[in-house]
């Protein structure tokens, strides 16, 4: 489903823990990392798509998370010309995204990247809040900056009220 301007409706998901860190996921078989995201199906609300993508990509359900916030507006990014599929009609030139900030209320062990026959990710880790803005692929950077800026006050207040962890594991491989 591509809109009249060539953008595909999509949801993005920022998952934070009680310390205000965010989940950073490694794309399957690649060296690139990003937040979970995915398309909105016809007839599906942004929130419904978010819960579907949450389960498909990281194996979490509604009971594992709490919605803390969502972006006020749709945020857009254009794909680099080399990634646009010009032979597919209608042509998709980018994504327009509704973002959700979720708090993991379950356990790290509930995260499972292997719920789909074609997994999006093969590993993940908790990172500091602003880390993804510097690390995501360049064409998504402006959207990430805007999302993180919009969600910052909610996440920081959560982190201020949480006990500090003793130690944090660096990286987790897929489970399955």
Curated annotation (Swiss-Prot):
Keyword Hydrolase belongs to the record: yes
Q: Which cofactor does it need?
A: a divalent metal cation
PROSITE patterns in the record, alphabetically?
NUDIX, NUDIX_BOX
Q: Which residues form the Nudix hydrolase domain?
A: 6-149
Q: Which GO terms describe its biological process?
A: mRNA catabolic process
Any one Gene Ontology MF annotation carried by this entry is: mRNA 5'-diphosphatase activity
Q: Where is this motif: Nudix box?
A: 38-59
Q: Which cysteines are joined by disulfide bonds?
A: none
Which CDD domains does the record match to this protein? NUDIX_Ap4A_hydrolase_plant_like
Instruction: Give one Pfam family, short name only.
Output: NUDIX
Its EC number is: 3.6.1.-
The leader peptide range reads none
Q: What class of enzyme is it?
A: hydrolase
SUPFAM superfamilies on file: Nudix
Which family is this protein grouped under? Belongs to the Nudix hydrolase family. RppH subfamily.
HAMAP family, per this entry? Nudix_RppH
Protein name stated in the entry: RNA pyrophosphohydrolase
Provide the organism lineage as a comma list: Bacteria, Pseudomonadati, Pseudomonadota, Gammaproteobacteria, Enterobacterales
Gene name of the encoded protein? rppH
